């Protein structure tokens, strides 16, 4: 007789999702330093209007350091097994749903949603979606095409002691589509 299937959504990130700050001289760093902000374009295209969100996961969980905001950022890995190299924040701007500006909402459980400003830090394990413009209740709405700029703000902490080798900034995050 047939099968009913939900609409599928396909995400895409510009630059293959890679932010490369190049080589940074340890001598140029103070105790901690902000690197130039990077922007990745994220698009999610669905076969039909779909109720969904984008969830961010830190693949270097436990390695983040960002001053007092350590829990709200993604990690860059360790040096020497224990030295946290720093962290990076994700924020979104220029959010559009089906070609129109849309309010950003977030949730940690997919049930309770909160309206947020576009430049608010996107915490690991939290989901971002869009609500209806002008609505008081922060609830996700179905969209077919979602587009946004993902801003990446990186802060590096200078390792202590003599450095005799290159140290990779090994940050990694996964953005997953969550069907609601």
Which residues make up each language-model segment?
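Mature extracellular/passenger domains of Gram-negative fimbrial/pilin and adhesin proteins
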Residues: 1-180
């Amino acid at each position: 007789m047939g099968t009913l299937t939900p609409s599928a959504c396909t995400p895409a990130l510009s630059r293959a999702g890679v932010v490369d700050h190049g080589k940074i001289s340890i001598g140029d760093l103070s105790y901690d330093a902000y690197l130039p902000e990077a922007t990745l374009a994220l698009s999610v295209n669905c076969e039909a209007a779909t109720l969904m969100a984008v969830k961010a996961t830190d693949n270097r969980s436990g390695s983040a350091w960002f001053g007092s905001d350590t829990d709200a950022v993604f990690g860059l890995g360790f040096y020497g097994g224990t030295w946290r190299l720093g962290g990076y924040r994700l924020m979104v701007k220029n959010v559009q749903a089906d070609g129109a500006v849309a309010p950003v909402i977030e949730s940690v459980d997919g049930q309770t949603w909160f309206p947020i400003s576009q430049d608010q830090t996107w915490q690991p394990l939290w989901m971002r979606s869009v609500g209806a413009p002008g609505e008081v209740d922060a609830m996700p709405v179905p969209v077919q095409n979602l587009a946004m700029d993902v801003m990446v703000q990186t802060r590096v902490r200078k390792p202590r002691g003599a450095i005799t080798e290159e140290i990779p900034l090994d940050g990694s995050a996964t953005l997953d589509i969550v069907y609601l």
